[in-house]
């Protein structure tokens, strides 16, 4: 940049302007404002972070933007100053441009090098592709960075370097043989997975260095990477997602699982799960080794634990993109801190095994696939933290089968965050075809934004719109600015009640674009269609007044009052929501939290939420506190992420949080009122809206709800990351069955079996108190008797299914076989299908399937020391919702129309009535013609 602004500032300080009268200064200032040389660029709503300014970015900046100092001077003085400084500015500009042009040959993606090699021998081009592939592991498309990374690998271990280079070469050649996209090959996108495969196969080999036979599996595994990459990109293209290092993870996991530690030809390093609590003395922690962990964590992306190798890799990143280097270091620090929060052994932290996944996640979110703003910078930190705990969970789970975690944690967590949908303008995801490196990504975003702002709003000429804008500015008294709405402001008239669905599905968009062929007004009746009965009664009263009696009229009036009173507390309590829209945000937020508490059971009713919270306090006040905190944090996070306001108001971003808080308290081995437990409750509850948004983006392709999948993912990751032997947050020890249960059928107690019905309903919230289950049944009945009925039926089905496979009686009495069947029976029996006798039978079948699936998953997950949670319900209900049939009695509702079973059936009957009327009209018109 030119140094002219600094010189101008110094001149002003040395010779201050003479004092002038206030009137003359006002006229001069007014003339400056009307001058055509006044900067007319609009302000950026996303202020640029301090970036390395590239030559192409300098071209975007106007000369007036170089200085933020406004100097008031006369026009003749301005012209003289410009004439005298024009040669000096031109020479300084040429010098600065030549410097940046020289730097641009080495930084960024070195596009000039790629263009120069186009007409050179293929050997040189192939070498460029291999070097770019080595650097693409860290999202860097720069051959110089790749060369430096190879130097760092040689410092670590020359044998590993040979294996990694062979993997890159073979993977790139396989992509050429398969005729993959040439531009992707030239960018190294088909080489980086082979690089990692070669390196990690050598790292995990139990043989000594230079075991040349190992190059055979390296060759074959690397050749599979382009095939897997092409297949995954075909699937991920539907959501415009990258494949990351998934091909490497698949190939490496298959190789290590196929060989193992006891293979004669290719033995691998033995990986075993933790079997005892680690011995940690906090006074023995060494700060120099902790600081050394930062470059070591970066080096562990390539499987290297040498701090000098990590430092060399950081230099390679800085050459291409300082922002990538910065976020890599930040990600390594976040992983280090996350490891300390769960009392990880110091040796594991020092080797950087907690950091490398965080490095990749922080780089990917912090400016690579999202435009870098302060919002996405914070999002990158959250993603790195989530990735650290996910990595710990996957490491413990995969250690059971003797396989290392690879970079699965990075892939799964980053893909989840890339699927996030938000209305926040500061979170902008780039199209995959426009992704280069963070600095260029931000320049592209600012350029596109500036061009959009300069476009005339009504399609007129640019000068006309500019002139119109000046006239509007002059007529300031007549300008009306839109009133800003609070984050708590909800247009209740536009809310469509939905259950377990987030965002706007494709089906809903089609309905808004293509209206139905018949008119439909959403019925305002509640439950048993009492208002329709009243209207018919009024007609009879008007037509047959002479035959009515005073008793009948009084009964009708009483029925009206009862119906109106019931409508205030049953169903969705829409009147409560509409009455709160102009009240304090605190009352609105309380309504959302209560609705979120009841949405676990598909109920959108704050009164039911109050009863459920009361039942939780009857069970255990500590559990109730933890669950309420989870609901609050999950709802607040959804507000911060600018999720759909109607979904937040319906409690659809709170129910996963309440389950997370409850089950973390239930499975804690520290007992009640262990207040430190609230910290992981807060963290894991905050991830629920992110997981919900990501899953809804995927499931919207099939118009499916996300159910309690976010809760299942969050709790499973937490329990797997901590485990029974964790010092800070130990969980209950779960072990698989190793002996045949001793069951005597004469010992079965029928009263306890009957009590298992309400207990099974209470176990949806992790409660085994029958009184709590009874209160939950009352809460369900208040909102919808049909939901209450199917909940009881589902719990009964689960109990009978458990008896049919000789489940130990204690498990049946505690309701552990009934809660998944309860949720599945409600979901199919009138919630997402219209209630008919066919769907009623389908709900019973789904409940039975969920019970047996629950037993299967309980046995499988117990091997990893994990509970089944509500995985069986989610998998079975989603399976039955994907069912297609020509049976007219099985009608699946669009997600945008789902409310509660009684209203769902009223909607369906009104649609059928209108459809039949339209068919009769068409038939009559055809008959007349």
Curated annotation (Swiss-Prot):
Q: Provide ranges: composition bias, Low complexity.
A: 31-42
TM annotation in the entry: 133-155, 162-179, 184-204, 212-232, 241-261, 310-330, 349-371, 378-399, 400-420, 609-629, 647-667, 675-695, 704-724, 773-793, 812-832, 841-861, 863-883
Give residues where Phosphoserine occurs.
486
Q: Which GO biological process categories is it annotated with?
A: urea transmembrane transport; urea transport
Sequence ranges of Gly residues compositional bias: 458-470
- Could you list this entry's UniProt keywords, alphabetically sorted: Cell membrane, Glycoprotein, Membrane, Phosphoprotein, Transmembrane, Transmembrane helix, Transport
- What Gene3D superfamilies does this protein's entry cite? Ammonium transporter AmtB like domains
The terms describing its cellular component in GO are: apical plasma membrane; basolateral plasma membrane; plasma membrane
Pfam families named in the record = UT (PF03253)
Question: Can you name one GO molecular function term for this protein?
Answer: urea transmembrane transporter activity
UniProt lists compositionally biased (Basic and acidic residues) regions at 1-11, 55-88
Domain of life, per UniProt, equals Eukaryota
Q: Which family does it belong to?
A: Belongs to the urea transporter family.
Protein name, UniProt field? Urea transporter 2
């Amino acid at each position: 940049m030119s140094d002219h602004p600094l010189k101008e500032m110094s001149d002003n300080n040395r010779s201050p302007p003479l004092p002038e009268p206030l009137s003359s200064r006002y006229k001069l200032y007014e003339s400056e404002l009307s001058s055509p040389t006044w900067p007319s660029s609009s302000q950026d709503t996303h202020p640029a972070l301090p970036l390395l300014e590239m030559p192409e970015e300098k071209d975007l900046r106007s000369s007036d933007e170089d200085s933020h100092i406004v100097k008031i001077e006369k026009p003749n003085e301005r012209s003289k100053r410009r004439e005298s400084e024009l040669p000096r500015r031109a020479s300084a500009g040429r010098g600065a441009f030549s410097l940046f042009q020289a730097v641009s040959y080495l930084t960024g993606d070195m596009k000039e090098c790629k263009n120069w090699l186009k007409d050179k021998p293929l050997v040189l081009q192939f070498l460029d592709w291999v070097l770019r592939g080595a650097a693409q592991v860290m999202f860097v498309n720069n051959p110089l960075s790749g060369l430096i990374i190879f130097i760092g690998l040689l410092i670590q271990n020359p044998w590993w370097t040979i294996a990694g280079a062979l993997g890159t070469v073979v993977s790139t050649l396989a992509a050429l043989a398969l005729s993959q996209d040439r531009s992707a090959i030239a960018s190294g996108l088909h080489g980086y997975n082979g690089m990692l495969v070669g390196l990690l196969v050598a790292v995990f080999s139990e043989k000594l260095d230079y075991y040349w036979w190992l190059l055979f599996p390296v060759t074959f595994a690397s050749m599979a990477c382009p095939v897997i990459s092409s297949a995954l990109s075909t699937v991920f293209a539907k959501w415009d997602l990258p494949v990351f290092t998934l091909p490497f993870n698949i190939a490496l996991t298959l190789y290590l699982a196929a060989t193992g530690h006891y293979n004669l030809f290719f033995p691998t390093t033995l990986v075993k799960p933790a079997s005892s609590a680690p011995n940690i003395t906090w006074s023995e922690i060494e700060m120099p080794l902790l600081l050394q962990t930062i470059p070591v964590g970066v080096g562990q992306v390539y499987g290297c634990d040498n701090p000098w190798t990590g430092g060399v890799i950081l230099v390679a990143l800085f050459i291409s993109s300082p922002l990538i280097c910065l976020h890599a270091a930040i990600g390594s620090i976040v992983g280090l801190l996350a490891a300390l929060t769960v009392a990880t052994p110091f040796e594991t932290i020092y080797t950087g095994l907690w950091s490398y996944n965080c490095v990749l996640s922080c780089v990917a979110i912090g400016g690579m696939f999202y435009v870098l703003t302060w919002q996405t910078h914070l999002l990158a930190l959250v993603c790195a933290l989530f990735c650290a705990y996910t990595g710990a969970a996957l490491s413990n789970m995969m250690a059971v089968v003797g396989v290392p975690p690879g970079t699965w944690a990075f892939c799964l967590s980053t893909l989840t965050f890339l699927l996030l949908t938000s209305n926040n303008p500061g979170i902008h995801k780039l199209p995959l075809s426009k992704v280069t490196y963070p600095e260029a990504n931000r320049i592209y975003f600012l350029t596109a934004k500036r061009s959009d702002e300069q476009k005339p709003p009504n399609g007129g000429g640019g000068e006309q719109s500019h002139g119109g804008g000046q006239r509007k500015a002059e007529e300031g008294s007549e300008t009306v600015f839109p009133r800003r709405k609070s984050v708590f402001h909800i247009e209740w008239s536009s809310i469509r009640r939905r259950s377990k669905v987030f965002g706007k599905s494709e089906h809903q968009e089609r309905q808004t674009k293509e209206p139905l062929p018949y008119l439909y007004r959403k019925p305002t009746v509640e439950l048993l269609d009492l208002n329709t009965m009243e209207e018919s009664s009024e007609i009879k009263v008007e037509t047959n007044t002479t035959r009515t009696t005073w008793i009948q009229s009084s009964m009708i009036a009483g029925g009206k009052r009862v119906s109106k009173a019931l409508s205030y507390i049953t169903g969705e309590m829409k009147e409560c929501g509409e009455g709160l829209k102009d009240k304090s945000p605190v009352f609105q937020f309380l309504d959302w939290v209560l609705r979120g508490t009841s949405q676990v059971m598909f109920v959108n009713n704050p009164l039911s939420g109050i009863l459920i919270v009361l039942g939780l306090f009857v069970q255990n006040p500590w559990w109730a506190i933890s669950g309420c905190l989870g609901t609050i944090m999950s709802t607040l996070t959804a507000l911060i992420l600018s999720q759909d306001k109607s979904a937040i108001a319906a409690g659809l971003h709170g129910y996963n949080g309440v389950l997370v808080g409850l089950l973390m308290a239930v499975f804690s081995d520290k007992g009640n009122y262990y207040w430190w437990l609230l910290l992981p409750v807060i963290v894991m509850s905050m991830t629920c809206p992110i997981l919900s948004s990501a899953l809804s983006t995927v499931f919207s392709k099939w118009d499916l709800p996300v159910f309690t999948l976010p809760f299942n993912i969050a709790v499973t990751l937490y329990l797997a990351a901590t485990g029974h032997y964790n010092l800070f947050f130990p969980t209950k020890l779960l072990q698989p069955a190793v002996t045949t249960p001793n069951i005597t059928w004469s010992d079965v107690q029928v009263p306890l079996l009957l009590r298992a019905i309400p207990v099974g309903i209470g176990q949806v919230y992790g409660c085994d108190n029958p009184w709590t289950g009874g209160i939950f049944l009352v809460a369900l009945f208040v909102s919808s008797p049909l939901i209450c009925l199917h909940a009881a039926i589902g719990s009964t089905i689960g109990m009978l299914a458990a008896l049919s496979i000789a489940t130990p009686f204690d498990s049946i009495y505690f309701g552990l076989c009934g809660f998944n069947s309860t949720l599945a029976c409600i979901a199919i029996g009138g919630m997402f299908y219209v209630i008919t006798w066919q769907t009623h039978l389908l709900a019973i079948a789904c409940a039975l399937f969920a019970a047996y699936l629950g037993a299967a998953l309980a046995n499988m997950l117990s091997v990893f020391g994990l509970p089944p949670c509500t995985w069986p319900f989610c998998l079975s209900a989603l399976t039955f919702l994907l069912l297609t049939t020509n049976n007219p009695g099985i009608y699946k509702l669009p997600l945008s129309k789902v409310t509660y079973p009684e209203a769902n059936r009223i909607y369906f009957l009104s649609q059928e009535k209108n459809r039949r009327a339209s068919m009769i009209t068409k038939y009559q018109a055809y008959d007349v013609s």
